Amino acid sequence: MSVSTSYPGIYIQELPSSSHAIVPAPTSIAAFVGYSHPYQTATFGKAVQIFSFTDYQTYFGGLFSSGITDASLPRAVYQFFLNGGSTAWVVGLQPGLFGGTDGPARLGPGGVYPTLTIATTGGSLVFSSLQPIDSVTPSIRLTNVRTSGTVFDVIVTYGTQIETYRGITLPVGTKPAPTDPNVMINGISKLVTVAAGSGGYGTSYTAPNTAPAWVDVTATSQATGYSTGYSADDFLGNSSTPGIFEPNSTLDNVEIFNLLLIPGITDNAVVSAALAFAERKRAFCIIDPPPQAPAVAVPPPAKPPQPQPIIDWVDPPTAGSYMLPESQNGALYFPYLLSTDPVTGNVIPMAPSGFVAGIYAATDASRGVWKAPAGLATNVLNTTGPVSSGIMNDQQQGVLNLQSINCLRAFSGVGTVVWGARTLVAANPAYQQWMYVPVRRLTLFIEQTLLANLRWVVFEPNDEPLWVAITSSISAFMLSLFRQGALQGSTPSDAFQVKCDSTTTSPADQAIGIVNIVVAFAPLKPAEFVVVQIAQLAGQTAGA
């Protein structure tokens, strides 16, 4: 663009830069898929972005305890944020068996809830539980009843949670009053709602001789042969419902996430689908072990059946059994960790994936994605240590480590730490370049960064000026990684190479609109084995 001149002197013209700055991609956005709160999830089957566990409680109802609906998802999200996580996507699922066809009626919004009916004079108070009651039973007490029976307090207890509503009154008039049962409780309580029975709320309350009992809608699952609500179809889909890991699914449409978790799920078909999905999305999948798997086989004279040792689950000795799928985009962590359940106050085993994902995020923030998320600095928070069956010594871990099983260990004076950084292909000689978690995650980070930052190249003239601009942009990005200590080598030329010229893009490529870019780099590998050699100097005199 020419400069319009009029007076003798100096004119300044700002020119657009031909260089394009590359913005690094995020590294620790986690995606969680699993069963969410059966009564308080706003929308099942939809990916929702959250930035705290408070956000999770808003959209998915928070923690719960149930022996029918698996509660690993909320526990994993809870541990993720406690251990350093900051951003996540969550897809909450409802067991398809609770659909009202061949199992219990659909639970929660638009369906049914467990109920408890308290009789009053001329009517009743019908309480609906907003929490599963098959594992923890809510307690509802009407106390401090005035002589007239028209004023009383309601105390609701569920595990460690207690709610008190004082000065509730009967009867309920035609116009809502601040002390009506439904006005005081509904929309405020996280544990129950209340409604009038078929005869209305009644006029007064007199304590009964026997306490009323809950009617649990999920109890029919036992009668129909379902001891658990789990089904692989909830994750993989069926003829009428697409799976979470299929193209154009709600999670597939999320532009970028880095970590994929299916907390507590060990079904081979679901794990295989999750790993394949992670590979397609350039993400890394953190796999949980079976909850009861011990570190080593239980020796005789233990009575059968005994839980399958973790190494036999990864590589079964029995012909025809499914092996844990191999993938450079995944890692297995073992064992389950003990942690206090905020719902019940009891110490229970929890799947390790949520803890580990938080450690990934914390390590990325403090050291970088190229640092192995393992070592004494990876102190796992909110756990009292591994379950007893997962406690091991160095020799026992050595056997597991060679089978790509990353262990969580408790060391005296340190606490519980991540003590392994191998991918699922580490034991395969054909995939040794992807043996270590940080090497694979650094590669995925570079791929995601370049994919997001090179869109400007599309439809540009495919010739030398474009090639120079591409090389300049990528080289600047790789140089920044080198200066942060992400790459091996004493000089930039030792650490990385970027080529985009006539040697990578031929005239034939140009003719069909292809530009080829070659980015080579030398990743840092973790010091997994530290060998100390000690020699004694012979012939020395005492005190020399």
Show which residues each predicted segment covers.
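Extended, beta-strand-rich, solvent-exposed assembly scaffolds of outer structural proteins
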Residues: 55-58, 110-191
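Charged, gly/pro-rich, cysteine-poor intrinsically disordered low-complexity regions
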Residues: 189-191, 196-210, 214-219, 442
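Long, low-complexity, polar/charged, intrinsically disordered or flexibly structured peripheral segments
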Residues: 205-244
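Gly/charged, well-structured mid-domain segments that form the phosphate/adenylate-handling core
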Residues: 181-184, 198, 207, 474
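Short, solvent-exposed coil/turn linker segments
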Residues: 52, 170-171, 187, 225-237, ...
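Detector for intrinsically disordered, low-structure N-terminal pre-sequences
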Residues: 2, 90, 167, 171, ...
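Structured, hydrophobic secondary-structure cores that serve as assembly/anchoring elements
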Residues: 1-115, 126-128, 157-160, 245-544
